[in-house]
């Protein structure tokens, strides 16, 4: 059994990690940490996990083969040296996803720049071989995951793309702020990041395409839809051929329906799963491609992708512990 610890398990992604790992047939959870909730049972914070015999601790002296760092951005770089060499590490924050120059442009100074190059970017569909050999993996951001996987097959067709993102409230994390309380958040379609979103850096690094994000908060608890626009003069068949690079990927579903409500990806149909649904439309008259990609931001955009990376790192079947379909209706 793989001994797993989750550092920062009180947040939404931390809770989903605990849920997925608790059901994983090859994993034993040895520790879940939280400074705020140390000593409390896990269901006091994550009520859906009632019956799971785990308590939060604030002690980092635990036995683990893999450590998931589910802490806020900027925290991993402060604490990571406590864990280096003791276990494989999967970092859920942005601290080690991008190279030093890009990090400083989008986030500011980095406290441990010498460690960045030791991390592998944890997008299995693109870096499976590297992840298999890695000791340190940086889990991608949710917006970046949806955009990179949607854009990557077409990266040679354009140098720029406009990306419209519709994101749910859970993407903002669990910390209290005025924008997330129900009277302010309910029924909104709110622009909150019209340009220079930090996840643009991950897209640029992975695709070499300059992606210009505009992010909207919408009235969903979980789920994310990326609509990616770029110019293209060609034929639709070639676009489909490029997208079929994913045809053997266990968690990529290519949506090609020509009619009905489900003819394009919709986050409603991936909730609770590690799937990403990708489809496209081609406006030949105006030489415009629209790629649509939908994920559950907490699963394929977070905890599920981390478990997928863990499976690869430990030589397990990649889908182990993730072999379930989305819940419906939601």
Swiss-Prot record:
Keywords: Amino-acid biosynthesis, Arginine biosynthesis, Cytoplasm, Lysine biosynthesis, NADP, Oxidoreductase. InterPro entries: AGPR_AS, AGPR_type-1, LysY, NAD(P)-bd_dom_sf, NAGSA_dehydrogenase, Semialdehyde_DH_NAD-bd. It is an enzyme of class 1 (oxidoreductase). GO terms for molecular function: N-acetyl-gamma-aminoadipyl-phosphate reductase activity; N-acetyl-gamma-glutamyl-phosphate reductase activity; NAD binding; NADP+ binding. It is found in: Cytoplasm. Pathway: Amino-acid biosynthesis; L-lysine biosynthesis via AAA pathway; L-lysine from L-alpha-aminoadipate (Thermus route): step 3/5; Amino-acid biosynthesis; L-arginine biosynthesis. NADP(+) binds at residues 10-13, 297. The active site is at residue 142. GO terms for cellular component: cytoplasm. The keyword NADP applies. It comes from the Archaea. Its EC number is 1.2.1.103, 1.2.1.106. Pfam families: Semialdhyde_dh, Semialdhyde_dhC_1. One of its GO terms (biological process) is lysine biosynthetic process via aminoadipic acid. It catalyses: [amino-group carrier protein]-C-terminal-N-(1-carboxy-5-oxopentan-1-yl)-L-glutamine + phosphate + NADP(+) = [amino-group carrier protein]-C-terminal-N-(1-carboxy-5-phosphooxy-5-oxopentan-1-yl)-L-glutamine + NADPH + H(+); [amino-group carrier protein]-C-terminal-gamma-(L-glutamyl-5-semialdehyde)-L-glutamate + phosphate + NADP(+) = [amino-group carrier protein]-C-terminal-gamma-(5-phospho-L-glutamyl)-L-glutamate + NADPH + H(+). Belongs to the NAGSA dehydrogenase family. Type 1 subfamily. LysY sub-subfamily. HAMAP family: ArgC_type1, LysY. PANTHER family: [LYSW]-L-2-AMINOADIPATE_[LYSW]-L-GLUTAMATE PHOSPHATE REDUCTASE-RELATED, N-ACETYL-GAMMA-GLUTAMYL-PHOSPHATE REDUCTASE, CHLOROPLASTIC-RELATED-RELATED. Involved in both the arginine and lysine biosynthetic pathways. This is Putative [LysW]-L-2-aminoadipate/[LysW]-L-glutamate phosphate reductase.
């Amino acid at each position: 059994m793989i001994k797993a610890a989750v550092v920062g398990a009180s947040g939404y992604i931390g809770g989903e990690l605990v849920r997925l790992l608790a059901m994983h047939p090859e994993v034993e959870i040895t520790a879940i940490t939280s400074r705020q909730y140390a000593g409390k049972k896990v269901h006091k914070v994550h009520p859906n996990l009632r019956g799971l015999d785990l308590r939060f601790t604030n002690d980092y002296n635990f036995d683990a083969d893999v450590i998931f760092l589910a802490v806020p951005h900027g925290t991993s770089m402060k604490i990571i040296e406590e864990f280096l060499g003791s276990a494989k590490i999967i970092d859920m924050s942005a601290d080690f996803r991008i190279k030093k120059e890009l990090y400083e442009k989008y986030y500011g100074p980095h406290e441990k720049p010498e460690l960045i190059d030791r991390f592998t970017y944890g997008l299995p569909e693109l870096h499976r071989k590297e992840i298999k050999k890695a000791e340190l993996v940086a889990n991608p951001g949710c917006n970046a995951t949806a955009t990179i996987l949607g854009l990557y097959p077409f990266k040679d067709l354009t140098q720029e793309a406009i990306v419209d993102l519709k994101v749910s409230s859970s993407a903002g994390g669990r910390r209290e702020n005025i924008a997330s309380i129900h009277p302010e958040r309910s029924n909104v379609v709110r622009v909150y990041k019209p340009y220079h979103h930090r996840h643009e850096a991950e897209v640029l690094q992975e695709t070499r395409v300059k992606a210009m994000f505009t992010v909207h908060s919408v009235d969903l608890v979980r789920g994310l839809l990326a609509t990616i626009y770029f110019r293209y003069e060609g034929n639709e068949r070639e676009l489909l051929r490029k997208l079929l690079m994913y045809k053997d990927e266990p968690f990529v579903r290519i949506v090609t329906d020509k009619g009905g409500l489900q003819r394009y990806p919709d986050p409603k149909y991936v909730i609770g799963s590690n799937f990403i649904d990708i489809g496209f439309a081609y406006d030949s008259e105006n030489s415009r491609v629209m790629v649509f990609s939908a994920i559950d931001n907490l699963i394929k955009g977070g905890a599920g992708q981390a478990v997928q990376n863990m499976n690869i790192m430990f030589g397990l079947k990649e889908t182990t512990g993730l072999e379930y379909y989305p819940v419906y209706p939601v």
